[in-house]
UniProtKB/Swiss-Prot annotation:
Catalyzes the oxidation of either pyridoxine 5'-phosphate (PNP) or pyridoxamine 5'-phosphate (PMP) into pyridoxal 5'-phosphate (PLP). InterPro entries: Pyridox_Oxase, Pyridox_Oxase_CS, Pyridox_Oxase_N, Pyridoxamine_oxidase_dimer_C, Split_barrel_FMN-bd. Its cofactor is FMN. FMN binds at R90, F91, V92, L93, Y105, T106, K112, Q169, S170, W216, R226. This is Pyridoxine/pyridoxamine 5'-phosphate oxidase. Binds 1 FMN per subunit. The keyword Lyase does not apply.
Length: 257
């Protein structure tokens, strides 16, 4: 019966007068837009709470955390590039930040980790829609110490620790049942009070060390505000007109939207 239904569906599609449209379908969504902030809600240099990017990030991040509509304010889209020059992006969770950089954890056998091994230059973006704000980070990544990775691993829920052991991230798998069977076996082994799940050697953390951090705030008239912190080029001097002296070796500038 199922095969007959599939045949009928295929025939109906093939005989459809709209088949040409279906094959060449192009949807125009150019008119989709939302209103951002009002003209009196601009993000100016005088509004910076810090003259270095980490203090400014802390301020914006805490505002995002305070908004219950933002379920995962620490989610960031991480972009990597393979040795062949092909980019890819995915969301990861930032698990710590400070003047040294931004921390995230993953499987060292994953696509992102293989990209990083061949090319440690990455970009990451936080986007908080309800605030009409984003933060763009460009820099390089380094592996965190094994001790750091192990300490964080054991702060995770046990089910998450087991999932990390059960999944060989980014490798093809026959079915979800295979994963579930691995998980079941690991649960039988480790879901025992007082028994610790060992961190897999292929799992750990990275530190994203920024070269630049850009703060973007959307404006209703599309003249968006962009203030970028970056490390100065060799011999570059701040003129306090276009380029401003920051703190801790940073400079900042306003960019056209």
């Amino acid at each position: 019966m199922l095969n007959n239904c599939v045949v009928l569906i295929r025939k109906s599609v093939l005989l459809s007068p709209n088949l040409k449209y279906i094959r060449n379908m192009s949807i125009d969504i150019g008119g989709m837009r939302i209103k951002y902030k009002e003209k009196d809600e601009t993000f100016l240099e005088k509004h910076l709470v810090s003259k270095e990017p980490f203090g400014q990030f802390k301020s914006w991040f805490e505002e995002a955390c305070a908004r219950k509509e933002i379920l995962e304010p620490n989610a960031m889209c991480l972009a990597t590039v393979s040795q062949e020059g092909f980019p890819s992006a995915r969301f990861v969770l930032c698990k710590g930040y400070g003047k040294e950089g931004f921390k995230f954890y993953t499987n060292y056998g994953s696509k992102k980790a293989k990209d990083i091994e061949g090319n440690p230059n990455v970009a990451a973006t936080f986007y908080w829609e309800i605030l009409n704000r984003s933060v763009r980070i460009e820099g390089r990544v380094e592996k965190l110490s094994e001790d750091d990775s192990t300490k964080y691993f054991h702060t995770r829920p046990v089910v998450s620790q087991i999932a990390a052991c059960a999944s060989y991230q980014s490798t093809p798998i026959e079915s979800r049942d295979v994963l579930c069977e691995r998980e079941k076996l690991l649960e039988q082994q480790y879901m025992i009070p007082g028994k610790e799940v060992p961190k897999p050697s292929y799992w750990g953390g990275y530190l994203l060390i920024p070269r630049s951090v850009e703060f973007w705030q959307g404006q209703r008239d599309r003249l968006h505000d962009r203030i970028k912190f970056r490390r100065p080029n060799k011999g570059e001097v701040s003129d306090e007109r276009l380029l401003h002296e920051g703190e801790d070796g940073w400079v900042f500038e306003r960019l056209s939207p």
